[in-house]
Amino acid sequence: MSTQSVSSHNIESSSFSANQHAAEPSVATGGIISEIVYNADQPIVTHLLLPLLQQLGTQSRWLLWLSPQQRLSRPWVQQSGLPLDKMVQLHHINPLFTVDAMERALLTGNYSAVLCWLPHELTEEEKVRLRHAAQAGNTYGFIMRPESAGDDAYRLFPSLKIHSTLYH
């Protein structure tokens, strides 16, 4: 894995094991899934999420970006202060299998955070699967979903769902 570029990575061929991270201190225990519904014209989400990702980047584990539609910009990653040598991106995946890929990644325990861009809401069954996988892998999972016209009927304002065991 080169420290000079954002790397592609095969989830199933990772050489790390979940047990390597058991003794490592973590930001949260048990893993968690949060959904961020965003408006592409409002960069506030970036400002909210970056400090957490920077903190998670100090762990020995990877940061995984599942973004089927686009690639991460290397200059943006460098400018944002995220560790290039711990960034992994999968962008050549079928959008239909993105949730399955996220579940497998969360289960491995190899990632501090898994960010996943989805064009639609998750089913209840998918939410349960991801929640269990995040807890099993002690991993943060962020589901990034763009605001759609249908969301306007239910929301007066853009929303951010932040779930934390620190506040409950």
UniProtKB/Swiss-Prot annotation:
It holds the Pfam family SulA. Induction: By DNA damage, as part of the SOS response. It comes from the Bacteria. Keywords: Cell cycle, Cell division, DNA damage, Septation, SOS response. The keyword Acetylation does not apply. Residues 161-168 are annotated as: Lon protease binding. GO terms for biological process: division septum assembly; DNA repair; negative regulation of cell division; SOS response. The record marks 168 as: Essential for degradation by Lon protease. Residues 105-111 are annotated as: FtsZ binding. InterPro entries: Cell_div_suppressor_SulA, P-loop_NTPase, SulA_CellDiv_inhibitor, SulA_enterobact. Residues 1-20 are annotated as: Disordered. Is rapidly cleaved and degraded by the Lon protease once DNA damage is repaired. Belongs to the SulA family. Interacts with FtsZ. Component of the SOS system and an inhibitor of cell division. Accumulation of SulA causes rapid cessation of cell division and the appearance of long, non-septate filaments. In the presence of GTP, binds a polymerization-competent form of FtsZ in a 1:1 ratio, thus inhibiting FtsZ polymerization and therefore preventing it from participating in the assembly of the Z ring. This mechanism prevents the premature segregation of damaged DNA to daughter cells during cell division. This is Cell division inhibitor SulA. The gene is sulA.
